[in-house]
Amino acid sequence: MMMVHSMSRDMMNRESPDKGLDSGKYVRYTPEQVEALERVYTECPKPSSLRRQQLIRECPILSNIEPKQIKVWFQNRRCREKQRKEAARLQTVNRKLNAMNKLLMEENDRLQKQVSNLVYENGHMKHQLHTASGTTTDNSCESVVVSGQQHQQQNPNPQHQQRDANNPAGLLSIAEEALAEFLSKATGTAVDWVQMIGMKPGPDSIGIVAISRNCSGIAARACGLVSLEPMKVAEILKDRPSWLRDCRSVDTLSVIPAGNGGTIELIYTQMYAPTTLAAARDFWTLRYSTCLEDGSYVVCERSLTSATGGPTGPPSSNFVRAEMKPSGFLIRPCDGGGSILHIVDHVDLDAWSVPEVMRPLYESSKILAQKMTVAALRHVRQIAQETSGEVQYGGGRQPAVLRTFSQRLCRGFNDAVNGFVDDGWSPMGSDGAEDVTVMINLSPGKFGGSQYGNSFLPSFGSGVLCAKASMLLQNVPPAVLVRFLREHRSEWADYGVDAYAAASLRASPFAVPCARAGGFPSNQVILPLAQTVEHEESLEVVRLEGHAYSPEDMGLARDMYLLQLCSGVDENVVGGCAQLVFAPIDESFADDAPLLPSGFRIIPLEQKSTPNGASANRTLDLASALEGSTRQAGEADPNGCNFRSVLTIAFQFTFDNHSRDSVASMARQYVRSIVGSIQRVALAIAPRPGSNISPISVPTSPEALTLVRWISRSYSLHTGADLFGSDSQTSGDTLLHQLWNHSDAILCCSLKTNASPVFTFANQTGLDMLETTLVALQDIMLDKTLDEPGRKALCSEFPKIMQQGYAHLPAGVCASSMGRMVSYEQATVWKVLEDDESNHCLAFMFVNWSFV
């Protein structure tokens, strides 16, 4: 940008920060001087005083300008640059708002038409009811039949059988009909659309999302703004496997140019089944791409059936043929760049072919909206923001590489869940129980996802083994369960099994022959890699700290790493699937690293009612919840809270020919132990009878009563004050309840000189502050909770604590188990003494804490 060659006297007086300058003096810069200053500005927009003096010495043409005037020039230049960027940003926001306003006006017109249709139908229904009331029952029945016949005559089905749909002209006729039906759904009133809860339009929102009501099959519709050109959007969305995680493959079997400049494609699509309880689906469709007269680009698609005519699709022995009704996407260019995108998905998944308990999964427009329609819109927005540079990831990884990792994790997990024969999977003999299915694959190079090739396995004929199971969960929010599995891995995972899985990446892959039950617990550190724009999915690396307690355990002593994908942790998303998928990786973390994914997927099936004000975002106190739970299996929920979800578990391991049976036995036992752990977690999460959110039970074991007595007595002994004030009681149960419900966070940590202090007990407020449970509390170390100033303050006061018995720490900041920062006004630390006056532990009381 060229600067203005002269500045007025008033502007100089107004901009100059130096009151000592002559108010009648101003500087006229020559083009050469401006060029020299611009060169320096490009290298360093804010030069120091020494740099400005050096500039004057190096550039004789600036010798007649005072250093303070050059300082003012750089200030003005930075100001103009900031104004230019702000103006560009405001123009972008203004274009978004104008486009959104146009979109809302069109949506308003569509809704007005829909209201008019409903008013007309209401009047017509009233007329029919009035007419029917004046006739006999038999005549009214006959009138209904006649009315239905008249309606069918007014809306005759097109007679596709009269045309030859096996030639280009016949296919073009089908394509034009599909286009008309799709446009009537995307911008018209062909479907009764109802806006999804929580999906509100705005310049930064995902867009307008609606689902169908009372239509054949299930349907979803979305429209929003994307900052990409229409042809680029079409290119992205046509590549369905890149954004639809349930899409296994898309094969274009024929491409036929249409006479109007469009293109007709015959496409065979295979979809993954989301669980082990139902067969996968496939589609045989015609896809039509063309430009409209207004400059919009449209891609519509529909199934070819015996009713529509057309070529017969490939046979599907392992799939159930589903029907795609006219669907697609309409892309309209925006003034000033970008596009307005309309997406419609309308399918019939043949729900009657699945077990009754699973039918809600195939009959839910909400689930379709989240898995397909919203996923497509989010993917395009993600690409747009990555292209514009709005999204940047650390670690030097390109966004496309990180997206590929996420796709490979999901694809590998889907391959394991489905176990297709053409991928090389075959069932393995059962051990007598049918709760866990084990399949083996001796040719993993066949996998369509190529998440690992033949080089991944040794040349002596090794393979991949998968143990999987599905179970129904009652009243367990998927988001809460996935968050728990992610944050508290030590409560369900076996360190020995993790070590065995990680061993497949090393030079001697089977150095750990078998996992031992109850492997050593390990601390996990979660390192974030990337997060999608809407924060619905996150990619991260998990470091599992290794331990070795004896010489034979040296194989377990090294740290292990997992590449992990977590999604669906937002409890407010309706119909969302929650998933936690991970795979062992080595320290190099290469872009083409082989991945063998395992994990969990929880899909909501239905929700008959939601308890008022219920929130599952509460502490999952497994120990006390299981101890205090008295509900019998199958007991009805008096609150009417009755929603179900299906959990799918799949774990993959490598094996050689000599260890196949032992690995299979280990995998079965491991999956069964995980199922047992999840059942315990589910009991703690599910609402209790009698209240919407029942309070967590206070642990009432003799050890807990003794510890509380020691904590209270030691506090009084050291400080001379009562921990509970004037309301203090001496009975054990009352004292326990007072400590448990204390308003300040009270925590105990171990007092050992040869190991890092870990927390051993906390009251309810302490658990809330650390965002953990009594069981998981023992995995949290004190030094990882306190920040650096807090650790220094504790170290400086530690001699005083040991001598005097207590000390006060100043206000500071600590971290919860989820990484959230917590501020507190003061912390009191005191020694907890046993009855014989020996040291038992340290107690901490954090006063007036809050999340930052």
Swiss-Prot record:
Annotated compartments: Nucleus
Domain of life: Eukaryota
Regulation: Inhibited by ZPR3.
Region (ZIP domain): 80-130
Keyword DNA-binding: yes
Principal location class: nucleus
Annotated InterPro entries: HD, HD-Zip_III, Homeodomain-like_sf, MEKHLA, START-like_dom_sf, START_lipid-bd_dom
Tissue: Expressed in the center of the meristem and on the adaxial side of the leaves.
Stated induction or repression of this protein's expression: Repressed by miR165 and miR166.
GO terms for cellular component: nucleus
Basic and acidic residues: compositionally biased ranges: 7-22
Quaternary structure (record): Homodimer. Heterodimer with ZPR3. Interacts with ESR1 and ESR2. Interacts with ZPR3.
Family to which this protein belongs: Belongs to the HD-ZIP homeobox family. Class III subfamily.
Protein's UniProt name: Homeobox-leucine zipper protein ATHB-14
